[in-house]
Amino acid sequence: LENGLARTPPMGWLAWERFRCNVNCREDPRQCISEMLFMEMADRIAEDGWRELGYKYINIDDCWAAKQRDAEGRLVPDPERFPRGIKALADYVHARGLKLDIYGDLGRLTCGGYPGTTLDRVEQDAQTFAEWGVDMLKLDGCYSSGKEQAQGYPQMARALNSTGRPIVYSCSWPAYQGGLPPKVNYTLLGEICNLWRNYDDIQDSWDSVLSIVDWFFTNQDVLQPFAGPGHWNDPDMLIIGNFGLSYEQSRSQMALWTIMAAPLLMSTDLRTISPSAKKILQNRLMIQINQDPLGIQGRRIIKEGSHIEVFLRPLSQAASALVFFSRRTDMPFRYTTSLAKLGFPMGAAYEVQDVYSGKIISGLKTGDNFTVIINPSGVVMWYLCPKALLIQQQAPGGPSRLPLL
């Protein structure tokens, strides 16, 4: 969607995977969906080094609303859990240099059973969100037909645009239509949405992460061309810092989401996050790669019989990112290859930085064999910058070194 927004994948925090539809604020006040939860997460994002790295969206998900609309038919937040209202919450978030995302559902009800946005309510709800000062809308698709979705998702894009407020638009439409052509028209999606959920919701497990990785890379030829500045494929939230992933698996999710040019929307408790999870999510070089201005989605380029996979993402200034991923379950695996085997141009030399360890290999030539040691369900990730390209010139003076553009 060419609305000037989401020129790099959106980054921030999203309530759903970790906090779900917990509305029991009497017995569980710190974990329930309430204004306090979002205010506390905004404080953590602003004060614990997240905002400076680019994490800026505070995303409300389902179960924020009252069970009924008001007398004028407007959506209203639950008065007990959001006593100050959404506008006050938006002001609180904006005062910390952050942005607020809200959740709606194109249909009779939201997935959690709260008031949905039927086709006759689209303009009204867009106006309400704009008046509240919302910066992003995630529009889900429970309780609506394919026909209603085909009408409603483009209708909401127009309605948001006509409010005059810049609002990033996240569409769940393709996930409800199986995620693939011909049922999903990605050309149209790129024109009406800034990002879209293609596939299943992530759960707090490695199996869930793998199923998402499998689906996205199996279908990469269909999906990859449609990602770019202003329009992104969304494989769903980062679950790093929760319960289901090991340390290695957490590093793998971060690396693979970065290769995919995926939105980095964390869903974890930032008040209690472990130092090791925080370090993964706050890796500067990783975020720089994710936020690369070209916005090219990476691909799986090798799938070995040894259960090693290699992924490549082209970056600006002729740089690239490589991920070596092990699906093995036995022990650390020594994987030997060369940049030539991975399709890099001959005669080039690269400065390589390991994204997690920070170690640098200087002057790695395309033809040189190298070995990486990859832990079970783990990754090794490299950032590569060309040093120079050796070009044989016919001019006097023999070969000259020209920078690789």
Curated annotation (Swiss-Prot):
Gene3D superfamilies, per the entry: Aldolase class I, Golgi alpha-mannosidase II
Membrane recorded as keyword: no
GO molecular function, one term: alpha-N-acetylgalactosaminidase activity
UniProt-annotated glycosylation sites, renumbered to this chain: 161, 185, 369
Cystine crosslinks: 21-63, 25-32, 111-142, 171-193
InterPro entries: Aldolase_TIM, Glyco_hydro_27, Glyco_hydro_27/36_CS, Glyco_hydro_b, Glycoside_hydrolase_SF, Melibiase/NAGA_C
PROSITE patterns reported in the protein's UniProt record: ALPHA_GALACTOSIDASE
Source organism superkingdom: Eukaryota
Reactions that this protein is recorded to catalyse: Cleavage of non-reducing alpha-(1->3)-N-acetylgalactosamine residues from human blood group A and AB mucin glycoproteins, Forssman hapten and blood group A lacto series glycolipids; a neolactoside IV(3)-alpha-GalNAc,IV(2)-alpha-Fuc-nLc4Cer(d18:1(4E)) + H2O = a neolactoside IV(2)-alpha-Fuc-nLc4Cer(d18:1(4E)) + N-acetyl-alpha-D-galactosamine; a neolactoside IV(3)-alpha-GalNAc,IV(2)-alpha-Fuc-nLc4Cer(d18:0) + H2O = a neolactoside IV(2)-alpha-Fuc-nLc4Cer(d18:0) + N-acetyl-alpha-D-galactosamine; a globoside IV3GalNAc-Gb4Cer + H2O = N-acetyl-alpha-D-galactosamine + a globoside Gb4Cer
Transmembrane feature ranges: none
Predominant cellular place of this UniProt entry's protein: other
Top-tier EC class: hydrolase
Subcellular location: Lysosome
EC number of the protein: 3.2.1.49
Matches recorded under Pfam families: Melibiase_2, Melibiase_2_C
GO CC terms: cytoplasm; lysosome
SUPFAM superfamilies: (Trans)glycosidases, Glycosyl hydrolase domain
Binding site for substrate: 61-62, 138, 172, 197, 201
The keyword RNA-binding belongs to this UniProt entry's keyword annotation: no
One GO process term, biological-process aspect: oligosaccharide metabolic process
Catalytic residues in the record: 140 (nucleophile), 201 (proton donor)
Complex and partners: Homodimer.
Database matches in PANTHER family: ALPHA-GALACTOSIDASE/ALPHA-N-ACETYLGALACTOSAMINIDASE, ALPHA-N-ACETYLGALACTOSAMINIDASE
Family, as annotated: Belongs to the glycosyl hydrolase 27 family.
Described purpose of this protein according to its UniProt entry: Removes terminal alpha-N-acetylgalactosamine residues from glycolipids and glycopeptides. Required for the breakdown of glycolipids.
Entry protein name: Alpha-N-acetylgalactosaminidase
Organism: Gallus gallus
Protein encoded by which gene: NAGA
